[in-house]
């Protein structure tokens, strides 16, 4: 199976489970809402302190404060590790967990305050869309990533309901910044 097909399969598997999850939560908590963006403490490690919760509700019997419920996918795409070349960048792909994708970068500046991968801010603005500038009112879900964590040479991304293009754009951005190796797990 080609890398592009694996990405599509990983995304489709996750989003299918997300649809079922959202339906189940809405039945249990009709006042709840899927995909709500929240700001958390800056020291949380989340990029710009932003996070999109899978589902938020208020359960009057338990508390008046919001309750976040996260999807724990039961299925994930499994395959033997593969090697993929993107321009000058060699990738070892061991796993594609759409809701919890980890990328370890080699030989590239990391995106962080004061420097790093050029363009990560614009990528985040596009694919997290903090101000909900690109909202498709005809779509049930946002089509955005749910979080980005930058930790040294590692990126951790919850791609949420974002399309495959979000991952492709991130990989292209990393490659354009001179990264010669990426491990995806």
Enumerate the predicted regions with their spans.
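Structured alpha/beta or helical-core interaction and ligand-binding surfaces enriched in interleaved
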Residues: 1-185
